[in-house]
Amino acid sequence: MDFVVLEAGSAVAAAIDEWRHVKLFSPWRYDIDSAARRLLEQTGWVEPDLGKLPTGGELIDAYLAPLAKTPQLNDRIRYGAQVAAVTRVGFDRIRTPGREQAPFLVRLADGTEILASAVIDAAGTWRKPNVLGGSGIPARGEAELDGHITRALPDVLGRDRERFAGRRTAVVGAGHSAATTLLDLGELAAQVPGTEIAWVVRGTDQARTYGGGEADELPARGALGSRLKQLVQSGRVELVSSFRIESASLKNGQVELVAGERRVTADTVVNSTGFRPDHDIVAELRLDLDPILGSTRALAPLIDPNQHSCGTVPPHGVDELAHPEPGYYAVGAKSYGRAPTFLLATGYEQARSVVAALAGDWAAARDVQLDLPETGVCSSNLAYGDSSDETAGGCCGSAPQAVEVTTGRGLATGISGGLLTVIDQPTTTQSSCCG
């Protein structure tokens, strides 16, 4: 089965590289795909300590980068290949006769066009963060404050230290990205006098963010919430709850966030409100999306954060990921839409199932199995208060980034910002004048 991997970044796992300083909740034993391990073992690769928690940088350096350099993958990955659109040759979304026989057309940002018999969309959600506005659209004035708003997971104690030291920061959001940033800011505040922290959330009760504590089967994840709770109770973090941002503006050199008659001011705002999938690039394909989560309709009840935590999501694969457009599948974090209940191991099994189906091994494709650490920390239990989008796309470890294919089986999911295109017919590549 011929294939090509399209990576938008200049190197493997470009999105993870932006938060390489962050430690994952899941130890290595949950982070390495079995098919990827088989390929790496052929190169003399030394497996990391399976009980250790890797950082994003270690995930790249010890796993994803070596994987991308294996003989089976090295010549299959195209870097700097940002996907602009996916459609079918000669067909928009409306036209039907002969549709299934037409190849997919994948157009890159530089005008290059690639034909494919199937497309696995593992683009993730990192490039499409949610907005600060409390109604799902940007707050009034938000777009004009780019220089004062930073995206999730800044390197507070490292390369971004000067931006936060001795200044007031407002962290907006109630997910694990927000918790991680708040803890780093708390450490910075202990080192640098004058460092102030406000935590701005839409909900009324933060038990969901504080999580399972000692009951969490991923101890690092449970400890994260427990430490954050201590920071809030000590007064080092000012918790501003029930705050739905309506507008944002610059006043006397600081950002002013407004919710009704209430105001929050800060030198810098960290947008930790989560992420959402970008379906615009596949707008001409026929998708069956759940109207609430933005996942496939069949997958939605299995991952609903009102009913499930990360570890209680049942095994699922090609059947739940299929769309009315035969041959197109979204896997990984993108497949979950706005649900924050995603784990790396889930994406690995999704991708394995889809690749097995494309190879014609439907028995293997439907033999889906998952062994996940269970906890309530990723649920949106309504007893905890408002179930908003603040945690969307931000659950329980990183979006999957490794790609690995063996004959008929095995694919660790996702090249961030790119698209994995599986081709089982001769490849035709067309270039525009920009190519």
Question: Which residues make up each language-model segment?
Answer:
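Glycine-rich dinucleotide-binding loop and its adjacent helix/turn
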Residues: G56, A123-Q191, I197, L293-P301, ...
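Short, intrinsically disordered, charge-balanced linker/junction segments flanking boundaries
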Residues: M1-A8
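Glycine/Thr-rich phosphate-binding loops of Rossmann-like dinucleotide-binding domains
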Residues: P129-N130, H279-D280, R338
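Cofactor-binding loop segments of dinucleotide-utilizing enzymes, especially the Rossmann-like FAD-
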Residues: A8, A174, V200-R202, A333
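A Rossmann-like FAD-binding core segment of flavoenzymes
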Residues: A81, A85, E187-P291, A356, ...
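Feature captures the FAD/FMN-dependent oxidoreductase FAD-binding
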Residues: V46-K128, L239, E246-A259, T265-T268
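Glycine-rich active-site loop/strand segments that organize a redox cofactor
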Residues: A11-A62, A139-R140, G147-H148, A152-R159, ...
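C-terminal, flexible cofactor-proximal segment of oxidoreductases
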Residues: S272, R276, L293-G435
